[in-house]
Amino acid sequence: MSTTTTMRAWTYMQSGLPSQTIVLDDEAPSPSAAELGPDELLIAVNYVAMNSGFTTLMRSLPPQPYSLPHIYNRQKRLGVPEFEFSGRILAVGSAIPSTRPDLQPSTLVLGCCAAKRVFIEGKGALAERVIAPAAQLIPLRPLSTVTTQDDESPGPDPAAPPISLLEASGLSACGCTAVQVLDLTKLVAGDKLFVNGGSTSVGMLTIQVARQVLGQTGTIIASGTDTTLIRSVGADDVIDYTAQRPLHEFLRTHHADRPFDAIIDCVGVAELYTHCEPYLAPGKLFINLGAMTAKPTFWGLLSFVWNQHMAPLWPVVLGGVPRSYQFYSARPNRETLGRVMRLVERGELRMVVDSVWEMRDAKMAYKRMESKRAKGKIIVRVQEE
């Protein structure tokens, strides 16, 4: 049973499969209001959305991987995983009343833990309470107005949030990624986009945001095995990658005559980029969001990171690809979170949930993540709303 000084939290002390390395601590030290910086808030966590990238890190690196004291000595490492969550504000830092009056105690919020707390201090979100920066939080506000098609339609309830607290838990990092990556592509109405990994959580959000950018005249092609689901979020066509191998050969054969104006890879398949010249238009961008193909070892992850940095630098005369490349990860901030929520409020963006697990069953949730068969977000209910 947690108290004001202790809480339930899942922790891990070594690299490996999360389903095998995490341990539930019923008396983990709880953060308190006394620890808050001026721009930080104490949150009671209700839901945590799991992230495939964090699973890759946990398999390859120990907790607090960027903490210098741990790198240079054998000091015990301990970490709480994950960073995306939703919950209720318990306390606010001294600057919050003047800088963020929308963030007050008892307000429902969605957001992310600061990278410093997760990767250096080992204080992630899979716990009953977390400290998070105001810049990476946004309130889950009720709809401000009721819009109806006619007088007989009741319209949405203005007192109800546009999305549930459960669904909101997966919108901060993934939602910001989808919005920011579409900005990077500079796509316009009528363009053609390929999304690899269309049934991943970030893939489905990216497709939905892209539909708003491209309009009905644009074309969105995605890869995946659940055609109905991927089409339901806005894709025009779905390629079953299990039936079309290698995928890059299928794309070369069927899309070289009208190349894509951008490719967004949510999985991290290197061959898609190295062979993309025929099916990605000159001057257009290939963006990788995924690391699902990285080998789950320290050296495997190091090799993956090295390749991400070298891909855009390798000269064409030495075998490089004559197309621009960028590896991108989310940069959650207030402005982008606001854009995400406006899309949600207009009914243009929704979170697809693969499965929901109780706090005690987090190991099973990680097994689902490790299977790489999830279609949408895997969510852990930390405590009741």
Swiss-Prot record:
SUPFAM superfamilies the record matches: GroES-like, NAD(P)-binding Rossmann-fold domains
The keyword Lyase is annotated on this UniProt entry: no
Induction comment: Expression is positively regulated by the oxaleimides biosynthesis cluster-specific transcription factor poxB.
Binding site for NADP(+): 64-67, 199-202, 223-226, 241, 289-290, 372-373
InterPro entries reported for this sequence: GroES-like_sf (IPR011032), NAD(P)-bd_dom_sf (IPR036291), PKS_ER (IPR020843), YIM1/Zinc_Alcohol_DH_Fams (IPR050700)
GO molecular function, one term: nucleotide binding
Binding site for substrate: 156-163, 309-313
Pfam families: ADH_zinc_N_2 (PF13602)
Top-level EC class: oxidoreductase
CDD domains: MDR1 (cd08267)
Pathway listed: Secondary metabolite biosynthesis
Keywords: NADP, Nucleotide-binding, Oxidoreductase
Statement: the UniProt record of this protein carries the keyword NADP: yes
Gene Ontology CC annotations of this record: mitochondrion
Subunit comment: Monomer.
Function of the protein: Trans-enoyl reductase; part of the gene cluster that mediates the biosynthesis of oxaleimides, cytotoxic compounds containing an unusual disubstituted succinimide moiety. The first step of the pathway is provided by the HR-PKS poxF that serves in a new mode of collaborative biosynthesis with the PKS-NRPS poxE, by providing the olefin containing amino acid substrate via the synthesis of an ACP-bound dec-4-enoate.
PANTHER family in UniProt: ALCOHOL DEHYDROGENASE RELATED, RETICULON-4-INTERACTING PROTEIN 1, MITOCHONDRIAL
Similarity comment text for this entry: Belongs to the zinc-containing alcohol dehydrogenase family.
Protein name, per record: Trans-enoyl reductase poxH
Native organism: Penicillium oxalicum
Name of the gene encoding the protein in the UniProt record: poxH
